[in-house]
Amino acid sequence: MQIHTTVASLRAARARAGRVALVPTMGNLHDGHIALMRQAAGRADCVIASIFVNRLQFGPNEDFDKYPRTLQADIERLEAAGVAHLFAPDESEMYPQPQRYHVDPAPAQVSILDGEFRPGHFRGVATVVLKLLNIVQPDVALFGKKDYQQLMVLSNMVREFALPIEVLPGDTVRADDGLALSSRNGYLSAAERAEAPRLYALLCRIRDAVRAGDHDFLKLETEAMAQLEAHGWAPDYIAIRRQADLQPPVHADDPLVVLAAARLGRTRLIDNLEI
């Protein structure tokens, strides 16, 4: 695997590649990331992974400084997965001067759900991803469904800017007990890790209830929030939304997704499940 720390080096390698798939990450890789790499390998001649902890998407009281940075272990995992190139720039390479131009996603997409609780987050995500797409110029870009709202925002960005890039979603990879794999799971204490699968269990319960014909969505959401609170969680939201735009359902036959975000101790976990 070739490791590139500069835009010039990465672009030179890209020019020699055929059909390219890009998998952007912030590092601290787990099996969910590796599943995306393998999915990418099936859709392109060359897989390029990026690792960059993007300051722009972190709020002032979030975990930018303590976000796990495990570059050597990540390199070993990527090599084992057969990734051809790693783009691992430092902050001065990605932002040689303060970023003055940004991507502002449509307010209807980012004032809800995670955007309500993390103002500015999706602006930072969209800005760095557009920059990565311009640097790499991939044919395909892959993003995990665990970050469902992010996937929607980035898919819409690529479409509305008419970028010649196919956006592919990757299914959420879970531990045996159902917990969605996340780089932030490492923040959990042993007791919190034992409790954490409750979030997925509640999403499954909501999915099954809706499939069985229960359309009292507010009741389902409220009961699940109460269940989390009763077990020591601090939920931000549990919401049943349309898959297409993450707005509240209008018709009973709308394809739906249930999304959740909640704090367990000091760790904020997110998850979702299509219905």
UniProtKB/Swiss-Prot annotation:
Pathway: Cofactor biosynthesis; (R)-pantothenate biosynthesis; (R)-pantothenate from (R)-pantoate and beta-alanine: step 1/1
GO BP annotation list: pantothenate biosynthetic process
Reactions catalysed: (R)-pantoate + beta-alanine + ATP = (R)-pantothenate + AMP + diphosphate + H(+)
Chain residues that bind beta-alanine: Q57
GO CC terms of this entry: cytosol
Other remarks on this protein: The reaction proceeds by a bi uni uni bi ping pong mechanism.
Stated family: Belongs to the pantothenate synthetase family.
Protein's name according to its UniProt entry: Pantothenate synthetase
UniProt source species: Azoarcus sp. (strain BH72)
Phylogenetic placement of the source organism: Bacteria, Pseudomonadati, Pseudomonadota, Betaproteobacteria, Rhodocyclales
Gene designation per UniProt: panC
